[in-house]
Amino acid sequence: MKSKVIGWNINQRSGMGKGIPKFVIDELIDQNADIIVLTELFQHSTIGYFWAEMERAGYQYAVTQNDGTNEVGILWKKDVYTFRAVDDSVVTTMKNNHPNFLLVDLEDQNGQLLTVVGFRIRMVDYSQRAEELEIVVNKGNEKKNPVLMVADCNNLRRETTETSWNLQVVDRILSKGGFERHTPGGQSIFEEKADRGYAYEFAEDHLITRDIAVELGDYDREFVRRDRIAYPWGKDFQTYDKEHSRRVSVEPGFPDHAIVKGYLSTEKDQKK
């Protein structure tokens, strides 16, 4: 079976926003994905409404318990997948060097087990980001079945000169576990198009797989049409303010990453 998956950093920024905007719920429901991974989620006082709306739309969910910092949420259609297990043992605190990380085991209608991982590499020193990804890969290696990871890697621009953290370092660490990165063209943050071309594109949101085939979609910024006030620059989440000689971004609480998405099938499906 083919499943649609989406990942979205919704920019709750450890509670700096005022809760999840209603249009985010509308967008998630209209995307009609079988699996949803959300990063920079926060357990705001209004989070109960969000979960209730997603449950009404046919989803079940699991969420980290990082207590006061960024969370990861994984949602799945309950008529497509059966929940088997959750691993929320990697807890993020302000004093440790753990990624935002959540893992769930799901079983599809054919009895195929699928492990889904949502993670976000934090904005720490570059060498520490590599260490966080090592934690992710080690957890993924505990599983022998197909694995899907949906990630915000905070990996800098495509051709950064930073040697301790870049896409090549990401790929090298992922390869230790047999994982493959799938990244759309273009940028997932900042402006829709990089001013100086491919080398300066910030493509930080990815699908990562093992024993899964992926039909990758484009980075999706179409949700900006739902709130023109929150997104005054259209599909650009950031712009340069010439009057004050500074860059300005959308307000915290409103997503400032494009949606990453794709369609998945396991190797077992491909052999049928």
Which sequence ranges carry the predicted segments?
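N-terminal, active-site-proximal structural segment of metallo-dependent hydrolase catalytic domains
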Residues: 1-56, 69-71, 256-258, 263-272
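Structural recognition of the beta-strand scaffold that forms the well-ordered cores
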Residues: 7, 35-39, 73-74, 115-118, ...
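Structured beta-strand-rich core segments of catalytic domains in phosphoester-bond hydrolases
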Residues: 35, 39-114
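Metal-dependent phosphoester-hydrolase catalytic domains
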Residues: 86-87, 141-148, 155-272
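His/acidic metal-ligating clusters that form di-metal
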Residues: 103-105, 112-115, 129-162
